[in-house]
């Protein structure tokens, strides 16, 4: 049948011997469904479902209505693959951000009479109401009776038993495009478990609010942890779907396994598209400004400096009781999403970054850390969790550079070679121009 620019179903994947039979069957099925198909072998083991089928698949749920300029998320385009979910046992990896307009992904799938057998929950839990770093317990969802299996408790990777009654895993979580945000690590382990157990995985892509730039030191293998598993900069300029393609294509899964991966990409979106998240992705990233400042302020998490956890402005301020007197002060207290905030009940002199006119960062601002270092003087008073700081930075060099009094310009100059090499790798997996 004839394809058109605006009305076709395009698949993009790399020749992979073990999946050749599966791919052939897939193409036959797509042809039988009267869909236009184009094949491009370029992403190892991964299939990217690009454009619209000729007609909407009819199901008993409201079809989202968009203007031509609205970004459409992967979750908004369930019609692209909903038929292939029928008769399958489905697990979803999701949290409070997994919404189709005002309806949660879980409720949407159940309304379509699909067989959702379990939900995997990441850091902060299924409802996003658990403080950073706190263990998430497995439980039963009281509304649906479906098991909620924690991937941030006794184990961070689905076990063989967890997947024994599952055919396909759907991943839909809003990311913020920063290496130490742990949803990336959760996705890695889910991909790895699916690869080990022969399960298919679908990633519903979402815009990255920090996709418009790339910055920071590249993570060194010795500092791999759950707050950074891959050799990428702190800000990597990719959506979570593109990142999943990179994990597969670069062989970053254990034993260089390849996950049977489908990506449902966004539409009407580029990396330069400004996208304000409708739902906070975690308890302390509550505003556009906080999400923008997160790459610059998160390194403070390994210091004695407060970045506003336990206040109304997390990741919008920074301060310390031993800073010289300032016009702006704040006092952190335990509250929702911050059960034990740094400098709790102390009066912190500091700086309110909400007064800044710039709501969108274009680089990591090292001057906040340098200013705090200079105000505190004693490096022991400043960085009190050296090993954690190195894991966040992805190396041991940055801590030494701060201790030696390096300027932001001097520090940034050491990042350039790694960033240029990463850009060459990243380019292979980009879906949006």
Place the predicted regions along the sequence by residue:
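Glycine/threonine-rich flexible loop motifs
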Residues: 175-187
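Conserved anion/nucleotide-ligand pocket segment
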Residues: 224-294
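Glycine-rich oxoanion-binding loops at beta->alpha junctions
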Residues: 136-165, 178
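Short internal beta-strands
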Residues: 117-124
